[in-house]
Amino acid sequence: MKIVILGTAYPYRGGLATFNERLARQFQAEGHDVEVVTFTLQYPSFLFPGKTQYSNEVAPTDLRIKRWVNSCNPFNWVSVGRKIRKMQPDMLITCYWMAFFAPCYGIIERIVKGNGKTRCLALVHNMIPHEPSLLDKLFAPFYVKSTDGFVALSDSVVKDIDKLDKCRKPKTFSPHPIYDHYGERMSKAEACELLKLDADKDYMLFFGLVRAYKGLDLLLDAMGKMHDKLPNLRLLIAGEFYEQEEGYREQIKNLGLTEKVIIRNEFIPD
């Protein structure tokens, strides 16, 4: 089968890029012909709160990745749709996670399906984002109408799709897989030595981008209530802050956790 995956990938960084690249490799391992189409412009800078959108790792040599899509340029969407239509893929998989991309994906899908061959499958991480906006109601239905079927990575996302899918298109729930590309496990002692942590302490990990909806403030409150009972416990916050770090540091200070919380405010690569 000839498959085109449309979504974020190298040179962009993050979990979604990792997911799409791992998916492409799995399809290749199963004998399919796979190409990944990603962005020349993913987010305008004013929509991206982090330090950089780009990976500093070496480009993958085992994947065919084309940087074609400008998420903000409708003329580009038409051009990309025509290019993919000419490729005559059996399946176009659009990797969807927020309504900002719905017009772009929806236009491209409609054009690609003009070849009378390609089926469009939505691989949905979030139908309604963790931080909803008016865009969800305006744009998401347009995308849903252009898609032939859905794979959702959580049961709640299936329910969100049902609210928008008036045609009752095929959809299935496939739990988000566990990543298997991080290498061999190591002992706690080895890990603590590499990370320059005290191996005699117990660690609780908050890992990933720090955003308000993820509840770090609640975790800190909980730790403030239990740290006297668990004097050996330390909290390691490892990830880039998409919120103001100062507010969390003030909370840590007020809760008396300054010596018990370790912050690594940086993006953690694969």
Show where each model-derived region lies.
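N-terminal strand-loop element at the rim of the active site
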Residues: A9-R13, R25-K86, V157, D162, ...
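Glycosyltransferase donor-sugar binding loop
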Residues: F39-Y43, F207, R234-G247, E266
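Nucleotide-sugar donor phosphate/pyrophosphate-binding loop at the beta->alpha transition
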Residues: G116-L121, M127-S146, K159, M186-A189
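Donor nucleotide-sugar binding/catalytic pocket of nucleotide-sugar-dependent glycosyltransferases
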Residues: K145-M186
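A short helix/loop element that forms part of the nucleotide-sugar donor recognition site in Leloir-type
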Residues: G183-L197, E250
